[in-house]
Amino acid sequence: MFEYLKGIVTKIDPAYIVLDVNGVGYKILCPTPYSYDENQPATIYVEQVVRDTGITLYGFLSLEDKELFLKLLSVSGIGPKSAVAIMAAEDTDSLASAIQNGEVKYLTRFPGVGKKTASQIVLDLKGKLGDYVKKSTAAADLTPSLQDALLALVALGYTQKEVDRITPKLAKLPENTADGYVKEALALLLKK
Protein backbone atom coordinates (compact mmCIF):
# COMPACT_ATOMS: atom_id res chain seq x y z
CA MET A 1 0.00 0.00 0.00
CA PHE A 2 2.80 2.46 0.88
CA GLU A 3 5.96 2.90 -1.19
CA TYR A 4 7.79 5.22 1.19
CA LEU A 5 7.19 7.64 4.05
CA LYS A 6 8.93 10.99 4.55
CA GLY A 7 9.10 12.56 7.96
CA ILE A 8 11.15 13.19 11.09
CA VAL A 9 12.65 10.28 13.05
CA THR A 10 11.44 10.89 16.61
CA LYS A 11 12.60 7.66 18.29
CA ILE A 12 15.23 5.02 17.62
CA ASP A 13 14.99 1.59 19.27
CA PRO A 14 17.16 -1.50 18.63
CA ALA A 15 14.33 -3.04 16.56
CA TYR A 16 12.40 -0.07 15.18
CA ILE A 17 12.11 3.66 14.61
CA VAL A 18 9.19 6.03 15.00
CA LEU A 19 8.70 8.34 12.04
CA ASP A 20 6.53 11.44 12.49
CA VAL A 21 4.71 12.16 9.23
CA ASN A 22 2.58 15.31 9.57
CA GLY A 23 1.77 14.63 13.21
CA VAL A 24 1.21 10.87 12.88
CA GLY A 25 3.87 8.63 14.43
CA TYR A 26 4.51 5.43 12.47
CA LYS A 27 6.31 2.57 14.23
CA ILE A 28 8.52 1.00 11.55
CA LEU A 29 10.55 -2.17 12.14
CA CYS A 30 13.98 -1.84 10.51
CA PRO A 31 16.98 -4.10 10.00
CA THR A 32 19.30 -1.13 10.71
CA PRO A 33 17.48 1.43 12.90
CA TYR A 34 20.71 3.11 14.01
CA SER A 35 21.39 4.12 10.41
CA TYR A 36 18.94 6.96 11.00
CA ASP A 37 19.50 10.09 13.07
CA GLU A 38 17.00 11.11 15.72
CA ASN A 39 15.14 14.40 15.11
CA GLN A 40 16.31 14.44 11.48
CA PRO A 41 14.24 14.13 8.29
CA ALA A 42 14.30 10.74 6.58
CA THR A 43 12.75 8.88 3.68
CA ILE A 44 11.93 5.30 4.61
CA TYR A 45 10.97 2.74 1.96
CA VAL A 46 8.27 0.70 3.64
CA GLU A 47 6.43 -2.56 3.19
CA GLN A 48 3.13 -3.11 4.98
CA VAL A 49 2.61 -6.70 6.13
CA VAL A 50 -0.86 -7.76 7.23
CA ARG A 51 -1.12 -10.84 9.46
CA ASP A 52 -3.77 -12.25 11.79
CA THR A 53 -1.87 -10.71 14.69
CA GLY A 54 -1.81 -7.20 13.24
CA ILE A 55 -0.48 -4.81 10.63
CA THR A 56 3.25 -4.07 10.67
CA LEU A 57 5.39 -1.64 8.71
CA TYR A 58 8.92 -2.70 7.78
CA GLY A 59 11.29 0.05 6.68
CA PHE A 60 14.47 0.21 4.61
CA LEU A 61 17.15 2.74 3.68
CA SER A 62 16.84 2.08 -0.05
CA LEU A 63 14.41 0.70 -2.57
CA GLU A 64 16.94 -2.08 -3.33
CA ASP A 65 16.89 -3.18 0.32
CA LYS A 66 13.09 -3.26 0.25
CA GLU A 67 13.14 -5.37 -2.92
CA LEU A 68 15.60 -7.81 -1.32
CA PHE A 69 13.28 -8.06 1.70
CA LEU A 70 10.38 -8.93 -0.62
CA LYS A 71 12.48 -11.56 -2.38
CA LEU A 72 13.39 -13.11 0.98
CA LEU A 73 9.69 -13.15 1.91
CA SER A 74 8.96 -15.15 -1.24
CA VAL A 75 11.08 -18.03 0.12
CA SER A 76 9.12 -20.77 1.86
CA GLY A 77 9.93 -20.74 5.58
CA ILE A 78 11.03 -17.08 5.72
CA GLY A 79 8.65 -14.65 7.39
CA PRO A 80 9.03 -10.89 7.76
CA LYS A 81 10.81 -11.08 11.13
CA SER A 82 13.30 -13.65 9.81
CA ALA A 83 13.91 -11.58 6.67
CA VAL A 84 14.61 -8.47 8.77
CA ALA A 85 16.91 -10.46 11.09
CA ILE A 86 18.86 -11.79 8.08
CA MET A 87 19.20 -8.30 6.61
CA ALA A 88 20.24 -6.86 9.99
CA ALA A 89 23.01 -9.42 10.40
CA GLU A 90 24.71 -8.77 7.05
CA ASP A 91 25.04 -6.06 4.42
CA THR A 92 22.89 -6.70 1.34
CA ASP A 93 25.88 -7.00 -1.02
CA SER A 94 27.45 -9.87 0.95
CA LEU A 95 24.08 -11.54 1.44
CA ALA A 96 23.24 -11.39 -2.27
CA SER A 97 26.70 -12.65 -3.19
CA ALA A 98 26.39 -15.62 -0.79
CA ILE A 99 23.01 -16.55 -2.27
CA GLN A 100 24.30 -16.23 -5.85
CA ASN A 101 27.28 -18.46 -5.02
CA GLY A 102 25.11 -21.07 -3.28
CA GLU A 103 26.89 -20.72 0.08
CA VAL A 104 24.42 -22.68 2.23
CA LYS A 105 26.82 -22.93 5.19
CA TYR A 106 27.29 -19.14 5.20
CA LEU A 107 23.52 -18.59 5.27
CA THR A 108 23.01 -20.90 8.27
CA ARG A 109 24.76 -18.38 10.53
CA PHE A 110 21.74 -16.07 10.38
CA PRO A 111 19.18 -16.23 13.21
CA GLY A 112 16.38 -18.71 12.49
CA VAL A 113 18.04 -20.10 9.36
CA GLY A 114 18.90 -23.79 9.45
CA LYS A 115 20.40 -25.89 6.69
CA LYS A 116 17.00 -26.66 5.15
CA THR A 117 15.94 -23.00 5.04
CA ALA A 118 19.35 -21.90 3.75
CA SER A 119 19.09 -24.46 0.94
CA GLN A 120 15.60 -23.18 0.14
CA ILE A 121 16.88 -19.58 -0.01
CA VAL A 122 19.58 -20.59 -2.49
CA LEU A 123 17.13 -22.70 -4.52
CA ASP A 124 14.52 -19.92 -4.74
CA LEU A 125 16.76 -16.86 -5.16
CA LYS A 126 19.91 -18.03 -6.96
CA GLY A 127 20.03 -16.25 -10.30
CA LYS A 128 17.46 -13.65 -9.21
CA LEU A 129 19.89 -11.35 -7.39
CA GLY A 130 22.22 -10.51 -10.26
CA ASP A 131 21.63 -6.75 -9.91
CA TYR A 132 22.77 -6.75 -6.27
CA VAL A 133 25.89 -8.80 -7.01
CA LYS A 134 26.84 -6.66 -10.02
CA LYS A 135 26.59 -3.50 -7.92
CA SER A 136 28.72 -4.93 -5.13
CA THR A 137 31.45 -6.35 -7.36
CA ALA A 138 31.51 -3.53 -9.89
CA ALA A 139 32.90 -0.95 -7.47
CA ALA A 140 35.54 -3.38 -6.22
CA ASP A 141 36.85 -3.96 -9.77
CA LEU A 142 37.45 -0.26 -10.50
CA THR A 143 40.81 1.44 -10.03
CA PRO A 144 40.91 4.48 -7.72
CA SER A 145 41.57 6.81 -10.67
CA LEU A 146 38.55 5.39 -12.53
CA GLN A 147 36.38 5.80 -9.43
CA ASP A 148 37.52 9.43 -9.18
CA ALA A 149 36.71 9.96 -12.86
CA LEU A 150 33.20 8.53 -12.41
CA LEU A 151 32.58 10.86 -9.47
CA ALA A 152 33.84 13.78 -11.57
CA LEU A 153 31.38 12.92 -14.35
CA VAL A 154 28.48 13.01 -11.90
CA ALA A 155 29.78 16.34 -10.57
CA LEU A 156 29.83 17.63 -14.16
CA GLY A 157 26.10 16.95 -14.37
CA TYR A 158 25.85 13.54 -16.01
CA THR A 159 23.25 11.22 -14.51
CA GLN A 160 24.27 8.09 -12.64
CA LYS A 161 22.49 6.06 -15.32
CA GLU A 162 24.66 7.63 -18.06
CA VAL A 163 27.81 7.02 -16.03
CA ASP A 164 26.81 3.40 -15.27
CA ARG A 165 26.23 2.79 -19.00
CA ILE A 166 29.83 3.65 -19.94
CA THR A 167 31.58 2.28 -16.83
CA PRO A 168 32.16 -1.24 -18.26
CA LYS A 169 33.76 0.28 -21.38
CA LEU A 170 36.04 2.48 -19.27
CA ALA A 171 37.00 -0.45 -17.03
CA LYS A 172 38.25 -2.38 -20.09
CA LEU A 173 40.63 0.43 -21.10
CA PRO A 174 44.29 0.36 -20.03
CA GLU A 175 44.86 1.95 -16.61
CA ASN A 176 44.88 5.72 -16.88
CA THR A 177 44.79 8.88 -14.75
CA ALA A 178 41.46 10.30 -13.60
CA ASP A 179 41.80 13.08 -16.21
CA GLY A 180 42.49 10.52 -18.91
CA TYR A 181 39.42 8.51 -17.93
CA VAL A 182 37.26 11.66 -17.94
CA LYS A 183 38.40 12.48 -21.50
CA GLU A 184 37.62 8.92 -22.65
CA ALA A 185 34.26 9.04 -20.87
CA LEU A 186 33.31 12.35 -22.46
CA ALA A 187 34.13 10.92 -25.89
CA LEU A 188 31.89 7.90 -25.17
CA LEU A 189 29.07 10.04 -23.78
CA LEU A 190 29.13 12.40 -26.75
CA LYS A 191 28.91 9.46 -29.21
CA LYS A 192 25.57 8.21 -27.85
Swiss-Prot record:
It comes from the Bacteria. SMART domains: HhH1. Keywords: Cytoplasm, DNA damage, DNA recombination, DNA repair, DNA-binding. It is found in: Cytoplasm. Pfam families: HHH_5, RuvA_C, RuvA_N. Residues 137-140 are annotated as: Flexible linker. The keyword DNA repair applies. Gene3D superfamilies: 5' to 3' exonuclease, C-terminal subdomain (1.10.150.20), DNA helicase RuvA subunit, C-terminal domain (1.10.8.10), Nucleic acid-binding proteins (2.40.50.140). The keyword DNA-binding applies. One of its GO terms (cellular component) is Holliday junction resolvase complex. GO terms for biological process: DNA recombination; DNA repair. Homotetramer. Forms an RuvA(8)-RuvB(12)-Holliday junction (HJ) complex. HJ DNA is sandwiched between 2 RuvA tetramers; dsDNA enters through RuvA and exits via RuvB. An RuvB hexamer assembles on each DNA strand where it exits the tetramer. Each RuvB hexamer is contacted by two RuvA subunits (via domain III) on 2 adjacent RuvB subunits; this complex drives branch migration. In the full resolvosome a probable DNA-RuvA(4)-RuvB(12)-RuvC(2) complex forms which resolves the HJ. HAMAP family: DNA_HJ_migration_RuvA. Has three domains with a flexible linker between the domains II and III and assumes an 'L' shape. Domain III is highly mobile and contacts RuvB. The RuvA-RuvB-RuvC complex processes Holliday junction (HJ) DNA during genetic recombination and DNA repair, while the RuvA-RuvB complex plays an important role in the rescue of blocked DNA replication forks via replication fork reversal (RFR). RuvA specifically binds to HJ cruciform DNA, conferring on it an open structure. The RuvB hexamer acts as an ATP-dependent pump, pulling dsDNA into and through the RuvAB complex. HJ branch migration allows RuvC to scan DNA until it finds its consensus sequence, where it cleaves and resolves the cruciform DNA. Belongs to the RuvA family. This is Holliday junction branch migration complex subunit RuvA. It comes from Lactobacillus johnsonii (strain CNCM I-12250 / La1 / NCC 533).
